[in-house]
Amino acid sequence: GTRMKIIFVRHGEPDYRELEERFYTGFGMDLAPLSEKGRQQAQELCQNPLLGSADILVSSAVTRALETAFYVSCATGLPLRVEPLLHEWQVLESGVENFEKARTLFLENNGKLLPHCPIQYETAEEMRARFIESMAKYSDYQKVVVVTHRMLIRQFVPNETIDFCQVIECEIEI
């Protein structure tokens, strides 16, 4: 494998109101744009000098990530690639309560899915594999900015909490 320098960026704050009012669920919620505050976070993010040191910008296809990446691309001039497999952690039952319940189970069980678990979700191992598979095609690049989601980023960095538009540098074996 190759070691790849990755600059993780979590997307800005999204605004789900319009979709919630229309009872969208699952991937439908991923259509949510950034909120006013989220756009501000994305603009402030662009002042981070680390971003300009990368060779390419890769984003999750999910709107909140892609909109964040658009600001970074405009500010840095980095070429932007969209990767559909960099989406957020998958919980098979939809709804915010299930997501939070699943998250608690995921953390309690160290990212494993125990047999007879009431909620089915993606394991830590599956998430890591999906990320690495998705990033393999960028192995020729020295340093890559990746705009993606909290649970996915957490599989590679020790940070307990990751704020909107937080930047975290790390090295990963691809």
PLM regions: where:
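Active-site-proximal alpha-helix that buttresses catalytic centers in soluble enzyme cores
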Residues: 5-81, 166-168
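Short, well-ordered beta-to-alpha junction loops that form the rim of enzyme active sites
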Residues: 59-63, 85, 147-151
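Short, active-site-adjacent cap segments at secondary-structure transitions
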Residues: 15, 65-66, 89, 152-154
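Short amphipathic alpha-helical/adjacent loop interface patches that line ligand
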Residues: 42, 131-132, 150
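Acidic, low-complexity terminal tails and accessory targeting/binding regions
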Residues: 3-5, 48, 81, 85-103, ...
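Phosphate-handling substructures
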Residues: 18-19, 28-33, 74-130
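A short, acidic, amphipathic alpha-helical segment used as a generic capping/interface helix at domain edges
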Residues: 127-139
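Generic beta-sheet signal
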Residues: 6, 55, 140-150
